[in-house]
């Protein structure tokens, strides 16, 4: 049995983790095995790479270094968590995946899309998400939410231009492949966002059973 690979994407403060946990609860109520995970991270080694990526430091990180670290963590994550869970027939709910790399390292950092695509093919092979939920909201709201959480990580310290580019890249990718993406308005009250997730459940279950 093959499981279902669902990724949750969006800029800072979009509520991905909260809504990932909500969706997991709804699926588990139906007796479905759910594997919760995140990127960068998901395994002990990948989490150590995450620390390198997120921690502010004295030495600026080159954009290509950042990109390669992202895919190094992803390779470990795919081998250690994602592929085994899918082979068990689980629904994998992943907070960020390769769309985030296109958005942050491509849109935000300005790295060529072809470079990201080459690494995507090398690291992932034929693995792609079955469904991607993009939690969209205005940049100023997302940054205010991130600031309210406390100390900002290395990405959260970027300027508004960076995050506008991130947001637009997500929306462009969603528009190019509407069969895979669902865009949700993360600026709405949480109860309304989660009502939108409830409306998506039948489609998700159909994909799992199909």
Swiss-Prot record:
UniProt KW keywords: ATP-binding, Kinase, Nucleotide biosynthesis, Nucleotide-binding, Transferase
BP-aspect Gene Ontology terms: dTDP biosynthetic process; dTTP biosynthetic process; dUDP biosynthetic process
Keyword Chloroplast: no
Taxonomy, superkingdom: Bacteria
Catalytic reaction annotation: dTMP + ATP = dTDP + ADP
Transmembrane segments: none
Pfam families named among the record's database cross-references: Thymidylate_kin (PF02223)
Binding site for ATP: 10-17
Molecular-function annotations in GO: ATP binding; dTMP kinase activity
Top-level EC class as recorded in UniProt: transferase
EC number(s) on file: 2.7.4.9
Family statement drawn from the similarity comment of this UniProt entry: Belongs to the thymidylate kinase family.
HAMAP family: Thymidylate_kinase
Primary role: Phosphorylation of dTMP to form dTDP in both de novo and salvage pathways of dTTP synthesis.
Name of this protein: Thymidylate kinase
